[in-house]
C-alpha cells in the first residue's frame, strides 16, 4: 500500500516497484491478510489473526464424459448426524466422519460449461480451517485432541464418501465417468487467494465478530482506505458482502466533496412544493436504533442458549 501524509492511502505498490497513484483505495483482498501484510504492523492487525474464523472447504471440480439428469443445478446432501458434523468442522477443525456436501452442476443452466452430452460438476464439502495461519503443508498440524490435519488423507475420504453417498441415494455412479478433476483444500485456498487460515468465508459470525465488533469498511487511521469482502462489516456471504460494497460506494461518494448518492437521493425524493419539514417522518432514525438494539438482544440470547445447550452434551 502506498501511503502519504497523515497517513492517507495514495495508491498501491506493485511487485515490480511501480506505484499506481489514486485518490482512494478499495481493498478487496482478505482483510486479515491485508492488515498483516499490506499495511504497517499494528496491535490491531495482530489481534485480527486471533479472532474466530469461519470454515473452509474441500472442493472438487469434475469433468464428466456424460450427463446425469438425476442431478439438478443445485443439490444438497445432508448428513444424518448433523451435530457431529458441525463439531468436527468448528471444534476439531477436521472433516466429519459423515460429511454434508453441496453439489452444483453449472451445465444445467449454462450449456457452455461442458461439451455437448457431458456435465461439469462442482462439489463443496465444508471442513475446518487451518489451525495455524503459517501452515504450508498438506500434512497440516495437530489439533488440541492430537488429531492431525492431514489434508491429502481428508481429500481421499471426502471423494470416497461423496461418490458412495450419491450412488446410494440417487442410484448413479459418477466415479467411472470423471475424466478430469481439480481440487481445492484449505492450504490451496490460502496459497491462491491469501485467505487467512484458508477460511473461505473470512471471520466467523460469532458474537464478537458481528455488529460493531466487526472490522469497519473504512480504515480507522488511514484516510481514503476502504475494505470490502467477507471479513469486514456487515458480514460474510455473497448478499451481505454486496451490501458492504454498497456501503463503501456511498461512503466514497459522500466523502468526494459532498457528492450525492444517486440511489439514496432518488429513493428519498420528496416534492418540496407540497411537503414541509413538519410533514416528513422524523422517527426513522429512532427505528433504526431500535432495530439494532433488538438484534443485539437476540444475539445475546442466542449466545446464552448455545452455551446452555452445549452443557447438555
Predicted regions and their residues:
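Mid-domain catalytic core of redox enzymes
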Residues: 1-115
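Active-site-proximal substrate-binding core of FAD-dependent oxidoreductases
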Residues: 3, 252-293
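Hydrophobic, well-ordered secondary-structure elements that form the walls
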Residues: 26, 62, 123, 162, ...
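A generic secondary-structure signal for well-formed alpha-helical elements
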Residues: 29-33, 38, 42, 66, ...
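C-terminal segments that line or cap access tunnels to active or ligand-binding sites in enzymes
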Residues: 63-187
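A glycine-rich dinucleotide-binding beta-alpha-beta segment and adjacent secondary-structure elements
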Residues: 98, 102, 163, 167-234
